[in-house]
Swiss-Prot record:
Pfam families, sorted: UDG (PF03167)
Official protein name in the record: Uracil-DNA glycosylase
Enzyme Commission no: 3.2.2.27
Gene name in the database record: ung
Taxonomy of the source species: Bacteria, Pseudomonadati, Pseudomonadota, Gammaproteobacteria, Thiotrichales
Annotated family: Belongs to the uracil-DNA glycosylase (UDG) superfamily. UNG family.
Function: Excises uracil residues from the DNA which can arise as a result of misincorporation of dUMP residues by DNA polymerase or due to deamination of cytosine.
């Protein structure tokens, strides 16, 4: 099974056609939608299903100009690093020896290693957080999470914050490692995310199960 197989199947379903119709209608009204059309499915482009080792769930894309490009928590290289990603880097620096904090927030090199950076809602209207949360994307991304759980073994799922943690019911914990904490946003990072040790625990599990690990330093 590949992403193309999953996408081809889902695109035939009424809910998916409704999503595409909604986006086309909103664009026709002159509304700005992020990420741009060609970047909406970048998480699937950069992390092949066969190579997938880790899933990090976000909620919806960044809603300001030049930020969102289809990967959860990631921004274009020339954009300021968002606060949540700054806290992700802080946890990496705290827990990973010799981690070098990048001067950018472009996470494509994680994605290419098998870190699937999936927002549960794939689009957003400019400057309106969560504006597309009810248009059907979660039906699609819930299916994706479930397909990963059913068709892969020994994947590490990082669920940060209450929204992501609700997706735990879609994952078979007997086949995969589920790591949970508060969200890395400034509002909640100090209530459990900073100090969670997820990146260390992730690599311990991957080494044990697959004799592989993620090079979190590869961004530098």
């Amino acid at each position: 099974m590949t992403w193309s197989d999953i996408l081809a199947e889902e695109k035939q379903k009424p809910y998916f056609k409704q999503i595409l119709d909604f986006l086309a209608c909103e664009s026709a009204k002159g509304k700005v939608i992020f990420p741009t059309k060609e970047n909406i499915f970048n998480a699937f482009k950069y992390t092949e299903l066969d190579n997938l080792k880790v899933v990090i769930l976000g909620q919806d894309p960044y809603h300001n100009y030049n930020q969102a490009h289809g990967l959860a928590f990631s921004v274009q290289k020339w954009v300021d690093i968002p606060p949540s990603l700054q806290n992700i880097y802080k946890e990496l620096a705290r827990s990973i020896p010799k981690f070098k904090t990048p001067n950018h927030g472009y996470l494509v090199d994680w994605a290419k290693q098998g870190v699937f950076l999936l927002n549960t809602t794939l689009t957003v209207e400019a400057h309106k957080a969560n504006s597309h949360k009810d248009i059907g994307w979660e039906t699609f991304t819930d299916t994706v999470i479930n397909k990963i759980s059913e068709n892969k073994h020994n994947v590490v799922f990082m669920l940060w914050g209450s929204h992501a943690r609700k997706k735990k019911v879609l994952i078979d914990s007997s086949r995969h490692l589920i790591l949970e904490s508060t969200h890395p946003s400034p509002l909640s990072a100090h209530r459990g995310f900073l100090g969670c040790n997820h990146f260390v625990d992730c690599n311990k599990y991957l080494i044990e199960k697959k004799d592989q690990k993620i090079d979190w330093n590869l961004l530098c």
